[in-house]
Amino acid sequence: MKNLKSIALAFVVALSTLSVTAQTKQVDASKSTINWVGKKVTGEHSGTVALKSGALVFKNNALTGGTFTVDMTTLTATDLTGEYQGKLNGHLKADDFFGTDKFPTSTLVFKTIASKGNDVYTVTADLTIKGKTNPITFDITTKGNNATTALKIDRTKYDIKYGSKSFFEGLGDKTIYDDFDLAVNLKF
């Protein structure tokens, strides 16, 4: 009888450890989107950048982790066409902005996650752009095989100071605001 109880206890422990095993869901980079908007005194520009790879980690259907790599060489303005699009794309990839020849990728690594309920989580992560890492906090929603989030990033924290009134005086209508926005839709 004692052996039967020991076996039953071992079985229960084994089952309980199975239920808390982490499940890593690889993001389908080809179906996921990252849209950006950068604003200036006289208007704004918008575009896309491609996700290179990424994964979300779940335990008991709750988000517990995530890592992402963005291909900065794909940075593209979509609000312009022709020559003007080419000029803006080139400038955004130059050292004044993202320096994509030297820094072809950016990364995001989740550090802490708190559930807000209804598949919404508050995430604090380390964001690395141009070799500089800073914490960022945002909400992410997960539903089925989809996750969405919006991030506001202060580019000056990553040594992207071009056109920033925080660093240069007398820019007038040439001022570019420090924050840019990302709208992210992940498919996995």
Model-predicted segments: where are they?
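Low-complexity, acidic/polar, glycine-enriched regions of mature
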Residues: 21-188
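Bacterial Sec-dependent N-terminal signal peptides
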Residues: 1-25
